[in-house]
Amino acid sequence: MNEYLLPK
C-alpha cells in the first residue's frame, strides 16, 4: 500500500 493513501 502507498503511504499517501493512509490518513495522516
UniProtKB/Swiss-Prot annotation:
Main location: secreted
GO cellular component: extracellular region
Name the record gives this protein: Cytochrome P450-like protein
Intracellular or extracellular location(s): Secreted, Cell wall
Record key words, sorted: Cell wall, Secreted
Cofactor dependence: heme
